[in-house]
Amino acid sequence: MNLRPLHDRVIVKRLDQETKTASGIVIPDAAAEKPDQGEVLAVGPGKRDDKGAPIALDVKVGDRVLFGKYAGQTVKVDGNELLVMREEDIMAVVNK
């Protein structure tokens, strides 16, 4: 991937959502909602404080994160659909 996010932006790849419910019902692609979880692929250097020093981001590459359904901007890179979002659009990091 040849993307380097700027400032406090993060590149996220959506994780595939289950296509079957717990009771075994198969959910067709047309009815399935976009997943709200993803894996962080790249992070920017962070915002700058009043003195110009960078403020590091709380998320790092490889983190599994939760975000809003409409968070970020969708981009296609090398045939992969990715999200570019600000760190503030990420609601939580999922602990493994």
UniProtKB/Swiss-Prot annotation:
GO biological process, one term: chaperone cofactor-dependent protein refolding
SUPFAM superfamilies for this protein: GroES-like (SSF50129)
UniProt cross-references to PROSITE patterns, sorted A to Z: CHAPERONINS_CPN10
Record-linked InterPro entries: Chaperonin_GroES, Chaperonin_GroES_sf, Chaprnonin_Cpn10_CS, GroES-like_sf
Cysteine disulfide partners in this protein: none
A GO molecular-function descriptor: protein folding chaperone
SMART domains the UniProt entry points to: Cpn10 (SM00883)
Stated family: Belongs to the GroES chaperonin family.
Role description: Together with the chaperonin GroEL, plays an essential role in assisting protein folding. The GroEL-GroES system forms a nano-cage that allows encapsulation of the non-native substrate proteins and provides a physical environment optimized to promote and accelerate protein folding. GroES binds to the apical surface of the GroEL ring, thereby capping the opening of the GroEL channel.
Name of the protein: Co-chaperonin GroES
